[in-house]
Amino acid sequence: MQKKYFGTDGIRGKVGNSLINAEFMLKLGWAVGRVLANSHSATVLIGKDTRISGYMIESALQAGLSAAGVNIKLTGPMPTPAIAYLTHSVRADAGIVISASHNHYPDNGVKFFNKDGFKLSDELELAIEKQIDKPMKTVVADRLGKAARMNEAHGRYIEFCKSTFPSNLTLKGLKIVVDCANGAAYAVAPSIFHELGAEVVAIADDPDGFNINQTCGATDTAHLQEMVVKHNADVGIAFDGDGDRLIMVDHHGLRVDGDELLCIMAIDRFYLKENAPLGVVGTIMSNLGLEQTLKRHHIAFERSPVGDRYVLDLMQQKGWFLGGESSGHIVDLGFTTTGDGVITALQILRIMQQAEKPLADLKKVMVKHPQVLINVPIKGILDIAQNPNIKKAITEAEKQLNGAGRILLRPSGTEPVIRVMVEGSDEGIVRQTAEMLAAAVQQSTL
């Protein structure tokens, strides 16, 4: 059945438009409460990132849940993976995160975790949608839900993250620049690395409700790259607004993306024979160099559609524990149930310390193929497969690549853009081809 409200990662949009308004969020909270409270008194955790609209959405969800008879625990600003962990840890019935991830402050959204810390199933999302479309009724007064602040949330998550790092290792001797994206990680990430012994230089750690992901974070690492070089740091770490993805920077100031980090982690586990991966899941956007490198090490590789929930679905189907995306969402089921930027960073730092090698050397295990990604803004819906201009451009692009590359055009599941990706052996031809395709998409939207 087609979903009416839920997208690929919860519900997301422009604040004040579409579904991201107080009225709909009140109804959404009530609908979630109705689904959860059918058989018992339920408790839901609510966390958020640092967007100004988070206050409005949090209050509306809280009121709706209470009206349905559900108790609420409020954590305040917390990374998405922290809510996944805490939901299971405190035996809550569900967790809610108010965030639009890597998007800027005018956007916001809501995503959900079940009692085990995993994203909701399609069946549960459809059940919630069914309730949204019903008239809202408030339970009698003695059954209303209560709300309380969970003051220990930060401390519990910090200690959990530290527990994933070997107790016989420290980060002493490492200087780390941490870019918190003015987002949810600002209150926990610098403390975690500092408490493990690193010298920490924190940047983009002063959120004001409007500056989340603004020229900072995992989607814009230029300032982090400059700061790593300026401070003569060993490594840079960039989170996105809700802390579930990670991009790193080596001591030369060069980006290390999710494909490279995933490759480093997989090969490390393979040689340690600790939870040695039977296989690794990437996506249709993953660099061909990742697939080729893993296969050279006799590690199977499969591609899922884009989106960490699809990565996780395929991991669970295969019985594998490691997967991720080029964008820096990396899921390690040995530690977490969803992408966690802090825990991924700790695993890479562990490998650096144990191997006594800088990140610049570790990433050499994988040779990336030239790849260009261009996001083309669109209005409304564009049927890529049926548009004659785009079809003609794709035919021309295939001629330019001459069988030595990949072309992918797809609509984003979280933003009003068409993503144009071209990969091949010659960087100049790849860039030229990507720009030609992007121009064709842009012309088709006029």
Swiss-Prot record:
GO cellular-component term (any): cytosol
UniProt keyword Metal-binding present: yes
PTM field: Activated by phosphorylation.
Keywords tagged on the record: Isomerase, Magnesium, Metal-binding, Phosphoprotein
Listed EC numbers: 5.4.2.10
Record-linked InterPro entries: A-D-PHexomutase_a/b/a-I, A-D-PHexomutase_a/b/a-I/II/III, A-D-PHexomutase_a/b/a-II, A-D-PHexomutase_a/b/a-III, A-D-PHexomutase_C, A-D-PHexomutase_C_sf, Alpha-D-phosphohexomutase_SF, GlmM_bact
Binding site for Mg(2+): S101, D240, D242, D244
Entry-linked Pfam families: PGM_PMM_I (PF02878), PGM_PMM_II (PF02879), PGM_PMM_III (PF02880), PGM_PMM_IV (PF00408)
Co-factor requirement: Mg(2+)
A single GO BP: UDP-N-acetylglucosamine biosynthetic process
Molecular function in Gene Ontology: magnesium ion binding; phosphoglucosamine mutase activity; phosphomannomutase activity
Cofactor binding mode and count: Binds 1 Mg(2+) ion per subunit.
Organism superkingdom: Bacteria
Catalytic activity: alpha-D-glucosamine 1-phosphate = D-glucosamine 6-phosphate
Modified residues (Phosphoserine): S101
Catalytic residue positions: S101
Span of the signal peptide: none
Protein's job: Catalyzes the conversion of glucosamine-6-phosphate to glucosamine-1-phosphate.
Family: Belongs to the phosphohexose mutase family.
NCBIfam families hit by this protein: glmM (TIGR01455), PRK10887.1 (NF008139)
PANTHER family referenced in this protein's UniProt entry, alphabetically: PHOSPHOGLUCOMUTASE (ALPHA-D-GLUCOSE-1,6-BISPHOSPHATE-DEPENDENT) (PTHR42946:SF1), PHOSPHOHEXOSE MUTASE (PTHR42946)
Name of the featured protein: Phosphoglucosamine mutase
